[in-house]
């Protein structure tokens, strides 16, 4: 009999992609079904079943079939075999709606184009914590968390929340969730969640009741009046403006993060340094009620 380790190494990349997806779904969604695999890779149901069987053969005990959810759930001794389940690897994959992380190319530039990103400090939760959060989102269930807010010096407070969406602001990740204590929807920074437990209790709220998430408003921006005409014209070209105005449609819940990310002068008299704040907000009165914390 061929050792399982040898069989794992011999798996072709196309098949390995599907096995990685099975592993990521099982861990972070809490369940993976034949239909999930078929939909993600455009497979027939028999082909998806074959992949699930192969995974079970190569990683025995990792998946257990659960009749109540019509799919496979992580076994008690679940341990990743094909996928890197670290939050730093998985969250970008989830955000980009990709099926797999960490291709086989390593440092090889498969497009022949060098790229780089800013070396920002990691602001991520542990793998176990993130899995509880994502399972609650996927299963639309309540989530009990320990959360340390910036305003509290006390030990992390216990909260009951109902999460619906993961958000990447470019500087950090947070989860948008209904907070039972305050009876409203709020943002919870993932790195400040010290503990999390996905409960079997169904969530009572829904994203459709999160008005600030559902409703969008338009940010009306312009090159800063303190810049000379040449630089103002360059900025309009830079942002693809068709006239003298740059308009960005944003969910109300994300307005403050966009203002921060674009370094926009939100002062009433546009008094910020134009070299540091190259854009200014024109519809301050309309926007401030939804993102007052981001205003100067």
Q: At which residue positions do the language-model features occur?
A:
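A generic structural signal for beta-strand entry/edge sites
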Residues: 69-71, 172, 245
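Conserved short hydrophobic interaction patches
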Residues: 55-58, 196, 261-265
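Polybasic (Lys/Arg-rich)
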Residues: 214-296
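Bulky hydrophobic/aromatic content
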Residues: 74-148, 261, 268-281
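Core beta-strand-centered patch of the WYL/Sm-like small regulatory domain
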Residues: 112-230
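Short, basic/aromatic recognition patches that contact phosphate-bearing ligands
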Residues: 1-84, 221, 272-296
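Short, compositionally biased low-complexity segments
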Residues: 27, 98-112, 226-236
């Amino acid at each position: 009999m061929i050792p399982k380790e040898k069989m794992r190494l011999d798996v072709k990349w196309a098949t390995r992609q599907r096995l990685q997806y099975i592993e990521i779904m099982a861990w972070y969604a809490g369940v993976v079904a034949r239909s999930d695999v078929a939909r993600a890779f455009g497979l027939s149901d028999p082909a998806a079943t074959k992949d699930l069987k192969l995974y079970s053969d190569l990683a025995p005990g990792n998946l257990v079939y659960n009749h109540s959810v019509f799919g496979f759930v992580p076994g008690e001794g679940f341990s990743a075999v094909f996928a890197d389940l670290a939050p730093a690897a998985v969250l970008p994959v989830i955000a980009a709606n990709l099926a797999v992380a960490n291709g086989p190319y390593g440092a090889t530039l498969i497009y022949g184009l060098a790229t780089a990103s800013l070396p920002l400090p990691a602001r991520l939760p542990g793998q176990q914590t993130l899995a509880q959060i994502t399972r609650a989102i996927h299963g639309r269930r309540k989530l009990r968390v320990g959360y340390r807010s910036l305003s509290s010096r006390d030990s992390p407070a216990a909260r009951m929340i109902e999460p619906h969406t993961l958000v990447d602001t470019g500087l950090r990740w947070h989860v948008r969730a209904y907070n039972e204590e305050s009876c409203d929807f709020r943002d919870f920074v993932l790195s400040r969640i010290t503990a999390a437990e996905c409960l079997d209790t169904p969530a009572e709220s829904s994203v459709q009741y999160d008005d600030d998430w559902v409703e969008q408003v338009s940010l009306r921006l312009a090159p800063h009046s303190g810049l000379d005409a040449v630089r103002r014209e360059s900025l309009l070209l830079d942002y693809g403006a068709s006239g003298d105005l740059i308009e960005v449609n944003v969910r109300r819940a994300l307005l403050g993060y966009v203002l921060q990310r674009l370094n926009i002068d939100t002062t009433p008299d546009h008094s910020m340094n134009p070299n540091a704040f190259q854009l200014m907000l024109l519809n301050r009165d309309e926007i401030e009620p939804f993102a007052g914390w981001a205003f100067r």
